[in-house]
Amino acid sequence: MATESALIKVHVKSPSNKYDVEIAADASVSELKDKVLVFVPTANKEQVCIIYTGKILKDEETLTQHKIADGHTVHLVIRNQARPTPAPAAATPTASSAPSSNPTPSSQPNPTNNPFAAMGGMGSPADILNNPDAMRSVMDNPITQQLLGNPEFMRTIIQSNPQFQALIERNPEVGHILNDPNVMRQTMEMIRNPNMFQEMMRNHDQAIRNLQGIPGGEAALERLYNDVQEPLLNSATNSLSGNPFASLRGDQSSEPRVDRAGQENNEALPNPWASNANQATNNQSNNRSADFNSLLDSPGISSLMEQMMSNPSMQASMFSPEVINSIRQNMSNNPGLIDSIVGQIPSARDNPQISEGIRRSFPQMLNMMSDPSVMEAMRNPRVSEAFRQIQEGFSTLRREAPQLLNLFQAGAMGGGAFGSDANASSAGANSANGLADLFNSMNMGGGRPSSTAAPVNPEQTYASQLEQLQSMGFSDRARNVAALTATFGDLNAAVERLLNSP
């Protein structure tokens, strides 16, 4: 440079800190980022985002172009590290050829013309949860991976739970964790591998027990339980009267902390702050199974199914041709997959007719789910309400008179013992009953409508974040509120959402 440029001081403000940077007045934005990286060594240059008057500054632009002078303030946002997504190009050609290798519905005629007649007897999902192999099969299912790999879907599910909302308001760092797709992915990997999950829990218990031997450690654990763990348990079991994991505690007697000081623990850690459990030790396994059934019967899980069936974009992604073809190909390449699923259904194990009907219904169910007219009908609010009423009826029968539910299922399997007319309207009714059976098989919420939280004013909840967005130059308050609500108050994620939105 022929002439030496004057140095100016620029204030760089992040959501949690403020830095002063001395830089040449005509320096580029890229040079400013290099200066900022000194203060945030954990980030890379591609993640650094400089905002001034509501606009994101590009690397090749200069400070003088935006009239940034001495004493001016710019805002710093660290973008989330983008996780590379696997390219489905290799799977698509093979998936497209899968339908030709599968038997068509016409090759295996169904007496009732009902592709879902056997689905009503699938029983509780707790049977799958208690079986590691079945759980692994569910987690490897393309539909499950599609759902859990969608951050927007997971945010919507969490957002619908009032206990989670209250927890995130009290602990913003929890909201930041829930916005991290890597955390969700690692959690799903842990669930897919039960042995790894059990080992992780054992190490976790030992680490907490050892922490009790440190001065002040027990108080920190109590705060952790009261502020995080207890609200999390309540959010998952808000329909229950107690802690669903109470049966895992066993004997609550424990030696004083001073007697354990300096000693490494090799035993599992009981919960010292929850209510006392009066169950006998020999009933723990039965209680654990009942607890998981009650957990799956909570309104939060029920709202999950309702949101899945009321979100058009989610339905489009769940039942897209690529997903359907992938599932069909997996079923064709692995015949034992269906057998393993059927083997976990109690009613199917005892009834070969239901078992065979389930095996025959899978290909037809996939074909129906890929039919646009069926999906259009399922998006109709009146149809959804009708399915909800049918779901409640099946749930009531399952709880109050399971023998009648089995009788209905036997009638559907045997050619329509209840009002089977050999005409076109009867065939349509059978198809409708088939969809009802499908919803009943997906009934993870016990048929009860999900409880809704009292409306909360997001402008009051995120008042401080709204002020910071306003100071950054984002003047549209409605868009700011929507972005903060979608990201649970995470300012960095909200800014990134605003910048990426049209």
From Swiss-Prot:
PROSITE patterns: UBA, UBIQUITIN_2. Disruption phenotype: RNAi-mediated knockdown causes a reduction in lifespan. Induces ER stress characterized by the expression of hsp-4, the accumulation of ubiquitinated proteins and an increase in ubxn-4 expression. Mutants display increased homologous recombination repair in response to DNA damage compared to wild-type worms. Worms lacking both POST (F36D4.5) and ubql-1 have a shorter lifespan and display an accumulation of ubiquitinated proteins in the nucleus. Residues 455-501 form the UBA domain. Residues 8-83 form the Ubiquitin-like domain. May play a role in the ER-associated protein degradation pathway (ERAD) possibly via its interaction with ER-localized proteins ubxn-4 and cdc-48.1 and/or cdc48.2, providing a link between the polyubiquitinated ERAD substrates and the proteasome. Also plays an important role in the regulation of other protein degradation mechanisms and pathways including ubiquitin-proteasome system (UPS) and autophagy. It holds the Pfam family UBQLN1. Keywords: DNA damage, DNA repair, Repeat. Induction: Induced upon ER stress. One of its GO terms (cellular component) is cytosol. One of its GO terms (biological process) is protein export from nucleus. Expressed in the pharynx, hypodermis, intestine and head neurons. Upon ER stress, expressed predominantly in pharyngeal muscle, hypodermis and intestine. Residues 84-115, 274-290 have a biased composition (Low complexity). Coiled coil: none annotated. Disulfide bonds: none annotated. Residues 124-157, 161-200, 289-327, 351-387 form the STI1 domain. GO terms for molecular function: damaged DNA binding; polyubiquitin modification-dependent protein binding. It comes from the Eukaryota. This is Ubiquilin.
